[in-house]
């Protein structure tokens, strides 16, 4: 399903709907959001503008954790999802986005990557 992307408001200040000058162009369409969750790794490859490929992470159970005290990065297993401060509905549904907090074997980790855009889960250990 295609989603409209940007563009002006559909209503005038009086409440009347703007007359449509033309149909939507392909480049004006968006895509469905990738609701990344904790689970067995599953990715989706999407062809984007210019023939490039964007990898969307649907599910993953491991995160690359950076420890600022030691200055090292380690791959750790996610024990459970804790919170997502960006959206309370995402927090309720357990959706991983940038800024989400998960519990790993090493401790609490804040996600720093954008899994729906990058296709990888990176995070920083929270003390």
Swiss-Prot record:
GO terms for biological process: translation. GO terms for cellular component: ribonucleoprotein complex; ribosome. GO terms for molecular function: structural constituent of ribosome. Part of the 30S ribosomal subunit. It holds the Pfam family Ribosomal_S8e. Signal peptide: none annotated. The gene is rps8e. Belongs to the eukaryotic ribosomal protein eS8 family. Keywords: Ribonucleoprotein, Ribosomal protein. This is Small ribosomal subunit protein eS8.
